[in-house]
Structure formats: C-alpha cells, structure tokens
Regions:
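Metalloprotease/metallohydrolase-associated module, dominated by Zn2+-dependent proteases
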Residues: 1-49, 65-101
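Active-site recognition of the HExxH zinc-binding catalytic motif
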Residues: 52-64
Length: 101
C-alpha cells in the first residue's frame, strides 16, 4: 500500500506479539510502526472489528506519511472518530458531489 509515495506493509501477527505491545506494556489489537512503515494487526481480527482497527491504524500511517505531529491523545481521538464515522463521511461526500448542480 502506498501513502504519500511511501510504501507501507500490513502484517497480521499472533495475539500478544511484541509487535502489538505498547511502550507501557499493554497489548493492543493494532499497532503502526512509523520507522518500519508497517501496520501490525492481530490475526484474530475479523469483520467489523478488523475494519475499525485497520481504519484506526491507517490514520496513524497517514500522520506518519504526511509528517503530521500532534498530541498523541488528540491523534488517538481522530483515529477513533475516523474508524467509527469516516466511511459515512466519505460516502455522504460522494453522494453530495454526484447530486450537486
């Protein structure tokens, strides 16, 4: 996958993998590594949960790729919001653009 001319990988790893362990020791379902340009996902993710976790991690990949640095709590808020509502926003925009004028 390419974001802003930067190649990124998506890798599925086992639950509890070191790649899914945060700096505070907690384990997560997805992790984005800006150094290796890799999104790591728990290989047990399926369906809607996979969709939401991948959308969340893509936000982090876009932030890294466009060299955007904001407070981590705000970045997490944006990533969560987009994982929940981003697709609705884009579909609405597409529909509006097709029907304007």
């Amino acid at each position: 996958m390419i974001i802003n001319n930067i190649d990124w990988l998506i890798m599925f790893v086992q639950s509890g993998s070191p790649f899914l362990t945060r700096s505070d020791g907690s384990v997560t379902l997805g992790m984005t590594d800006g150094r290796t340009k890799t999104i790591y996902l728990d290989d047990n993710l399926r369906g809607l949960m996979l969709d939401r976790v991948l959308a969340h991690e893509l936000v982090h990949a876009f932030m890294f790729s466009y060299d955007i640095h904001i407070d981590i709590e705000f970045e997490e808020y944006i990533a969560d919001w987009i994982s929940l509502f981003g697709r609705d926003l884009v579909y609405l925009l597409d529909n509006l653009m097709q029907n304007l004028r």
